[in-house]
UniProtKB/Swiss-Prot annotation:
Keywords: Amino-acid biosynthesis, Cytoplasm, Histidine biosynthesis, Isomerase
GO molecular-function terms, A-Z: 1-(5-phosphoribosyl)-5-[(5-phosphoribosylamino)methylideneamino]imidazole-4-carboxamide isomerase activity
Superkingdom of the organism of origin: Bacteria
Source organism per UniProt: Neisseria meningitidis serogroup B (strain ATCC BAA-335 / MC58)
GO cellular component terms listed in the entry, alphabetical order: cytoplasm
Pfam families: His_biosynth
UniProt name for this protein: 1-(5-phosphoribosyl)-5-[(5-phosphoribosylamino)methylideneamino] imidazole-4-carboxamide isomerase
One GO term (biological process): L-histidine biosynthetic process
Gene3D superfamilies given in the database record: Aldolase class I
EC number: 5.3.1.16
Length: 245
């Protein structure tokens, strides 16, 4: 089970949001590159970046911070990024900078054909992020809940060639309320590609539950507030996950 530290970028700083609300941002660091190095030194084997401003603007907004992070750690571990990725040109620019994978979120739900085009243009490099409230996909920085069920979308995107799905339960993200294991497993059981859990990770019991779900296709978990506020020691948690594999 791979634990993936999240670095959410807002105006060049590392922050965490509650339930995707920009006004509910807590600043954890003014140096995202130092934060990235910290998690690498703690044993992280992959990093998850989110351009929060980009997610709302629809175009990249935190390029200097992203470049600094890649300069600091991309030679050692893969880095993935989502937020504001709406066209093939942006994907190409990001991959040229040194990102390992890009995550398509809102654009995937609004324009599913874009996912197929991206997978053809950049095979093996595309992840789809599905954010859900009560099983229904949410878009535009979680501002809008659609009528599309995430399971139906995941099946389509698997057929299009995405390498994995990141599943976020937006009712739990940043709330320290525990992972929605049942919903994550249900999604993972419907597709053959890996599913990464995101949102709600609070303690080592969540790690144990996720590791037990690994046999169903849950391949990893993105963790944010818990490791920044200290309810989870990242190095200890990854060691636990490794021991349970």
């Amino acid at each position: 089970m791979l634990l993936i530290p999240a670095i959410d970028l807002k105006e060049g700083r590392c922050v965490r949001l509650k339930q995707g609300l920009m006004e509910e941002a807590t600043v954890f660091s003014d140096s995202p590159a130092e934060t990235a190095l910290h998690w690498f030194k703690q044993g992280a084997r992959r990093l998850h970046l989110v351009d929060l401003n980009g997610a709302f603007a629809g175009v990249p907004q935190n390029l200097p911070a992203i470049k600094d992070i890649l300069a600091a750690v991309a030679k050692d571990i893969p880095v993935q990024l989502g937020g504001g990725i709406r066209d093939l040109k942006t994907i190409g620019q990001y991959l040229d900078l040194g990102l390992n994978d890009v995550i398509i979120g809102t654009a995937a739900v609004k324009n599913p054909d874009f996912v197929r085009e991206a997978c053809k243009a950049f095979p093996g490099r595309i992840i789809v992020g599905l954010d859900a409230k009560d099983g229904m996909a949410a878009i535009d920085g979680w501002a809008t809940v659609t009528g599309h069920h995430v399971i139906d979308l995941a099946k389509r995107f698997e057929d299009d060639g995405v390498n994995s799905i990141i599943y976020t339960d937006i009712g739990r993200d940043g709330m320290m309320s525990g992972v929605n294991i049942d919903a994550t497993v249900k999604l993972a059981q419907t597709v053959r590609i890996p599913v990464i859990s995101s949102g709600g990770l609070t303690g080592l019991d969540d790690i144990r539950a996720l590791c037990a779900a690994e046999k169903h296709g849950v391949a990893g978990a993105i963790t944010g507030r818990a490791i920044y506020e200290g309810s989870i020691d990242f190095a200890q948690a990854q060691q636990l996950a490794d021991s349970l594999d």
